[in-house]
Structure formats: structure tokens, C-alpha cells
């Protein structure tokens, strides 16, 4: 509504494309998150909080790993994919789509945290604060539009509130005694930063390498996924976690 008020209906086409990408990527990861949520619920109900701390870190890695397998190629080849999909790509669609993928990153990372809060049953205060944080997106975007008159700030505001919500979720789960924040930072976040430091130059290189065919894009995508798996094995996951993840995925596909 705010985008429409400031920039007209034409900007809504780019926003609609970004929303479709958001839905597709998040639903892909969420289909796996639904499979592991009972483990978190059961572990909390049994008051095995030390195990729960490990599960939160493990399932966070699992979720982010799946997200990156989809999001990194999509982020890298957004322009080419949109051109094939739409032919006539709306203004800002490329930028909106990439910024949306960043929003999804923090939401995927947050999922094991809010699932744990739900398992506790103490969600009233949590829901009020989270709702307040997320709704801040609207006034922040409005003020940015008034100052700079650039539609991109709608997504900058989304990213900002997604980060705030993630920080609050970490704090909330820590208060429940279900998360060692120091171990969460060192065991997950710092490893994730290391992974991104390696992956970002690959994305940057492909930004300046023009893709001329679908087959070339597919070949590059498989190369990126292969490199991502290798890098994740050494930087994000330990050997036991790597084995557990692929056993977990194989069980899910057998059920499907």
C-alpha cells in the first residue's frame, strides 16, 4: 500500500515478483522445517535442555544449508532467470528479488528459535514484542520514502526489522534456558560468516560473467552447489552433522 501510494501501481509488479520468489524459497525450506519441528517440541517437553541447545544449533545449520542451496544460485543468476521467466522484466524486480532473499535468510535462521518458544507455551509477551518489531517495517519505510523517495527502502526496512526480530528471538530462547548464546554465536553464526566470506566472491564473479544460455546457467549452478556443499562441509558443519543431515533428508524423501 505504501509503495503504491509513493511510487504508483507500476512498482507493484516488481514487488509481486519478489513476493513470489519469497514464497517459493521459504516454502521449500519450510517443508523440511515441518519435519524436524516435532523433535524440538518433544525435547522441550522432556526437559532435555542440553540436548535442545544442540538441536537448535544443528537444525539452524540444516535450514541455512538448504536455503543456501537454493538461494545462492538464484541470487547469482537472478537477472538471467527473470529474463527467461518474464521477457520484459519490470523496473526494480532484480533488486527487489535479491533483497527479498536476504529477508528470507534471517527468517530461515529464526525458525528453530520461534519453534522453541512455541514449544514453551509462553508466547503472549513474545508475540506482542515480535509483532511490534515486524510492524516497525511500515513507519521506517514511510520515513525513508519521505526522506529519499526510493522504493528500495521498503526492503531495507524489511531486512532491518528481520534482523531485530532474529536478535530478539535469540534473546528469548536464551531466557528460556534453551540456548547458550555464546555457543550459538561461535558454533553457528561465526561459522556462517566464514561460509559467506567464501561464497560471496563466487557470487561477485558471476555478476560480471554474462550467461548466454540455459545450459550454461545450469552448469554454473551445479558448480556453485558443489562448491557450496564442499565449503559447508568444512566451515559450517562438522562431520557428524553432515552425515545426520543427509540421513535426515533421505528419510524425508522416502516418506514423500
PLM region descriptions:
Residues 2-23, 91-95:
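Interfacial/gating helices of multi-pass transporter permease domains
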Residues 12, 125-127, 153-155, 184-187:
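Alpha-helical transmembrane segments and their helix-entry boundary regions
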Residues 18, 22-60, 114-119:
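Helix-loop junctions and terminal segments of transmembrane helices
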Residues 29, 53-108, 135-146, 201:
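Alpha-helical transmembrane segments of multi-pass membrane transport and lipid-handling proteins
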Residues 55, 60-75, 88, 130-134, ...:
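Short alpha-helical transmembrane segments in multi-pass integral membrane proteins
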Residues 101-132, 148, 177:
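Membrane-interface junctions at transmembrane-helix termini in multi-pass inner-membrane proteins
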Residues 124, 131-167, 174-175, 179, ...:
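Membrane-interface helix-loop junctions in multi-pass transport and translocation proteins
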Residues 174-181, 202-256:
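Membrane-proximal transmembrane or re-entrant/amphipathic helices at the cytosolic face
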